[in-house]
C-alpha cells in the first residue's frame, strides 16, 4: 500500500512540469458573419434562402503547449434574420444563432514568438433560433415558412489567423472562421412539395484580444 501511495504521489509530481509548461489564454472577439445561401426548389420555381449578414461575438478559453499545438473551447453568438428572396420579393424573420465548439490549433511558430500565424479545425453544435413574430401571411410561403422555432445542428469549424504578442500577457489577433452546418430546416421550413438541402457556410472575420498566463 505504501508503495502504491508513493507511486501515485510521484506520478502526480511528474505531471506538474507538463501543466506548468502550458500557456493559457482567455479572450473575446467581435466581427461579422457572412452566410452562403441555398435554393429552395418548388413546382413553381425556386427561391434563395439564407441568413442575413450581421455582427458576431465570441469568447474562448485556450491552451498552448511549448510546441506548436494548441486548442480552445469557444462560444459564439450572432445576429442575422432568416431571409427568402425571389426576384424582387423578399420575406424576412428576426433571428439569431449561438454555438459551442472545440478547435485544435497548429501554429507556424513556437510559443515564444511574438507573431504566430495559425490554422485550426474542430467541431461542435450550433443553434439557429427564430425570434420574430409569426404572421398569418408571409411572402413566398409557397417555398418556405420562416418560423419562431429553433434548430440544433452539428457544426464543423475551420479557422486561420495571426496572433500578435502586445506584451507578456496581452495578445491581439485577427482571424477568420468558417462554420459549416446542415441547412436548418426546422426554422426555414420547406413548404409542401418544396425541398432544400446542402450545407450553410458562415464566414466570420474578426478582431480579438486575449489575456495569456
How would you label these PLM feature ranges?
Residues 80, 167-213:
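Predominantly the C-terminal beta-signal and adjacent terminal strand-loop region
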Residues 1-23:
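Cleavable N-terminal export/targeting peptides
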Residues 60-139, 154, 202-213:
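Gram-negative (and chloroplast) outer-membrane scaffold detector with strong preference
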Residues 20-64, 71, 130, 204-213:
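Short glycine/proline- and aromatic-enriched beta-strand/turn motifs that initiate or cap beta-hairpins
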Residues 42-48, 84-93, 141-148, 190-197:
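Extracellular loop and loop/strand-boundary signature of outer-membrane beta-barrel proteins
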Residues 35-41, 78-87, 133-143, 184-190:
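Flexible, solvent-exposed coil segments and beta strand-coil junctions
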Residues 49-55, 94-99, 148-155, 197-201:
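Short sequence motifs at beta-strands and strand-loop junctions characteristic
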Residues 28-32, 73-77, 119-125, 162, ...:
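Transmembrane beta-barrel strands of outer-membrane/channel proteins
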Amino acid at each position: 500500500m505504501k508503495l502504491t501511495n508513493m507511486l501515485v504521489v510521484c506520478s502526480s509530481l511528474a505531471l506538474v512540469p507538463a501543466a506548468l509548461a502550458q500557456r493559457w489564454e482567455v479572450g473575446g472577439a467581435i466581427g461579422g458573419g457572412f452566410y452562403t445561401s441555398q435554393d429552395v426548389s418548388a413546382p413553381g420555381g425556386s427561391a434563395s434562402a439564407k441568413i442575413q449578414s450581421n455582427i458576431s461575438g465570441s469568447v474562448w478559453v485556450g491552451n498552448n503547449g511549448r510546441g506548436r499545438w494548441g486548442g480552445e473551447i469557444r462560444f459564439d453568438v450572432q445576429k442575422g434574420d432568416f431571409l427568402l428572396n425571389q426576384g424582387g420579393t423578399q420575406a424576412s424573420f428576426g433571428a439569431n444563432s449561438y454555438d459551442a465548439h472545440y478547435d485544435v490549433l497548429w501554429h507556424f511558430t513556437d510559443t515564444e514568438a511574438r507573431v504566430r500565424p495559425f490554422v485550426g479545425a474542430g467541431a461542435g453544435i450550433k443553434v439557429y433560433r427564430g425570434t420574430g413574430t409569426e404572421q398569418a401571411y408571409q411572402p413566398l410561403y409557397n417555398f418556405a415558412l420562416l418560423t419562431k422555432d429553433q434548430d440544433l445542428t452539428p457544426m464543423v469549424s475551420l479557422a486561420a489567423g495571426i496572433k500578435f504578442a502586445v506584451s507578456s500577457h496581452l495578445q491581439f489577433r485577427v482571424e477568420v472562421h468558417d462554420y459549416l452546418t446542415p441547412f436548418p430546416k426546422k426554422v426555414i421550413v420547406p413548404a409542401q412539395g418544396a425541398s432544400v438541402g446542402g450545407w450553410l457556410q458562415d464566414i466570420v472575420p474578426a478582431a480579438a484580444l486575449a489575456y495569456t498566463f
